[in-house]
Amino acid sequence: MSQISTKHRTVLFRRWMAIICCLIINIAYLVY
């Protein structure tokens, strides 16, 4: 159970990191 929860947590973390990176790139593109 713990391994599955940690794996799901890492997947969500990577997904959020990708979304945040996309937002930063879009903001930088709009600024520059």
UniProtKB/Swiss-Prot annotation:
Keywords: Plasmid, Virulence. Pfam families: DUF5463. InterPro entries: DUF5463. Belongs to an operon involved in the translocation of Yop proteins across the bacterial membranes or in the specific control of this function. This is Yop proteins translocation protein A. It comes from Yersinia pestis. The lineage of its organism: Bacteria, Pseudomonadati, Pseudomonadota, Gammaproteobacteria, Enterobacterales. The gene is yscA.
